[in-house]
Amino acid sequence: MPGGKGKSSGGKSSGGKTSGTEGANKKQQSHSARAGLQFPCGRVKRFLKQNTQQKMRVGAKAAVYVTAVLEYLTAEVLELAGNAAKDLKVKRITPRHLQLAIRGDEELDTLIRATIAYGGVLPHINRALLLKVEQKKKAKALEG
């Protein structure tokens, strides 16, 4: 167009959005896919927005960060619970395995102070009691 207004007719655009042929080949990706996560960033962002006071603004990177932390902690707990299930020679993770995994790890134990339903209790026998039982066994063996 004469006068320098509008798009130039020289073939190259002066900026802005790309032409239709280049944009059509790109497939839309979610925030989770871009960050390489399995957990949904959009849902976490929505929960963050809903649960803040006075409907504060939440940045996209904050939601991705919180999602990554949640995914990491979940993977850590599931790995330890899977190992506990494998040690007991079963193929299904139960609340008992989750309890053993969380209470067996010092850092997770301090982080997760909740009571796990149907988790049971950790097996623990006081050392003083163990010594008495062992001494009785030795005494019986010497007498017999």
UniProtKB/Swiss-Prot annotation:
The modification N6-acetyllysine is found at K5, K12. Residues 1-18 have a biased composition (Gly residues). Gene3D superfamilies: Histone, subunit A. It comes from the Eukaryota. One of its GO terms (cellular component) is nucleus. It is found in: Nucleus; Chromosome. Residues 1-36 are annotated as: Disordered. Acetylated once deposited into chromatin. Keywords: Acetylation, Activator, Chromatin regulator, Chromosome, DNA-binding, Nucleosome core, Nucleus, Transcription, Transcription regulation. Belongs to the histone H2A family. Variant histone H2A which can replace H2A in some nucleosomes. Nucleosomes wrap and compact DNA into chromatin, limiting DNA accessibility to the cellular machineries which require DNA as a template. Histones thereby play a central role in transcription regulation, DNA repair, DNA replication and chromosomal stability. DNA accessibility is regulated via a complex set of post-translational modifications of histones, also called histone code, and nucleosome remodeling. The nucleosome is a histone octamer containing two molecules each of H2A, H2B, H3 and H4 assembled in one H3-H4 heterotetramer and two H2A-H2B heterodimers. The octamer wraps approximately 147 bp of DNA. H2A or its variant H2A.Z forms a heterodimer with H2B. H2A.Z associates with the VPS72/SWC2 subunit of the SWR1 chromatin remodeling complex. Also interacts with RBP1/DNA-directed RNA polymerase II largest subunit. This is Histone H2A.Z. It comes from Gibberella zeae (strain ATCC MYA-4620 / CBS 123657 / FGSC 9075 / NRRL 31084 / PH-1).
